[in-house]
Swiss-Prot record:
It comes from the Eukaryota. Keywords: Heme, Iron, Metal-binding, Oxygen transport, Phosphoprotein, Transport. Heme b binds at residues 64, 93. Belongs to the globin family. This is Hemoglobin subunit epsilon. One of its GO terms (cellular component) is hemoglobin complex. Residues 3-147 form the Globin domain. The keyword Heme applies. Red blood cells. The keyword Plastid does not apply.
């Protein structure tokens, strides 16, 4: 499991407190679906995903993105216990949804890009390093059931 220092945890928590989860969630999931189009197969009930503008304007993408980022907020609250925090979501994505665990890593990287675009100079290399560690740890926790 990934170890986060007190400074890294503080940097993550500080930035997360300024995050607009609804806006950033839709943007993150939308970007994932545009940049990695094969991920769209997990969202075939979302309606029109035929173009980047259709995806980014899709209310179901926005709503699910908010749900994803709200769940990610649980990671912020439980940085030292991610495996337990995401046990049920890992089971759901593995057993029922059959999501390739690599997609969790891709979404984490997209989240880092969203953070960089939203926070600019505040998203220093040190802050990025902390977030990269966290999104990697979350991806591992979400993929735990697969092993």
């Amino acid at each position: 499991m990934v170890h986060l220092t007190a400074e890294e945890k503080a940097a993550i928590t500080s930035l997360w407190g300024k995050m607009n989860v609804e806006e950033a969630g839709g943007e993150a999931l939308g970007r994932l679906l545009v940049v990695y189009p094969w991920t769209q197969r997990f969202f075939d009930n979302f309606g029109n995903l035929s173009s980047p503008s259709a995806i980014l304007g899709n209310p179901k993408v926005k709503a699910h993105g908010k749900k994803v980022l709200t769940s990610f907020g649980d990671a912020i609250k439980n940085m030292d216990n991610l495996k337990t925090t995401f046990a049920k979501l890992s089971e759901l994505h593995c057993d029922k949804l059959h999501v390739d665990p690599e997609n969790f890593r891709l979404l984490g990287n997209v989240m880092v890009i969203i953070l960089a675009t939203h926070f600019g100079k505040e998203f220093t290399p040190e802050v990025q390093a902390a977030w990269q560690k966290l999104v990697s740890a979350v991806a591992i926790a979400l993929g735990h059931k697969y092993h």
